[in-house]
């Protein structure tokens, strides 16, 4: 009957979804084990390794918003520099993690030529509906590099 066919189709869809979830979990597990082992350098080679494949230019980004005082002399002072320094380490690490993930997604195990670019968006003040809106400072960081596959050079090859 049509209903039996419908039930069979739904059961097959459920099995496919479960398989996809299982594959995704396995992929994420492998990725989480591989990322900490990935080699990163600002240079263009690794001593004791040879580059066997260049996979292209990649980047990872992150940003943070830092609020500013909104009531002039009556507001609590916001030390933008202090808040930025607290956030900068975190957003640099996040950008570097994204960079590693991009390399992993290309099948690579290392990144060469890594550098960081920084972006600052000064806050704007907007007037709307009779009030003033104080927009936050925005600071961003981008980690750039070239994804590569490297192999360890064996002692007999050196």
Regions found by a protein language model. Give the residues of each.
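Terminal helix-to-tail segments of small alpha-helical proteins
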Residues: 19, 105, 116, 134, ...
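Histone-fold modules and their flanking histone-like tails across chromatin and transcription assemblies
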Residues: 25-78
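C-terminal edge-of-domain segments
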Residues: 128-158
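Basic, amphipathic N-terminal segments that precede the first structured/catalytic domain
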Residues: 1-39
């Amino acid at each position: 009957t049509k209903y039996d066919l419908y039930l069979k189709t739904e059961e097959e869809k459920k099995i496919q979804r479960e398989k996809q979830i299982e594959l995704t979990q396995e992929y994420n597990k492998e990725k989480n084990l591989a990322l900490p082992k990935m080699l990163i350098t600002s240079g263009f080679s690794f001593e004791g390794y040879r580059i066997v494949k260049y996979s292209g230019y990649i980047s990872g980004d992150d940003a943070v918003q830092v609020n500013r005082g909104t009531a002039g002399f009556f507001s609590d002072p916001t030390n933008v520099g202090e808040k930025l320094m607290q956030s900068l380490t975190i957003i640099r690490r996040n950008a570097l993690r994204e960079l590693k993930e991009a390399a992993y997604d290309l099948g690579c195990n290392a990144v060469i030529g890594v550098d960081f670019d920084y972006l600052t968006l000064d806050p704007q003040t907007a007037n709307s509906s009779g009030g003033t809106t104080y927009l936050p400072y925005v600071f961003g960081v981008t980690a750039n590099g070239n994804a590569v596959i490297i192999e360890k050079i064996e002692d007999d090859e050196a």
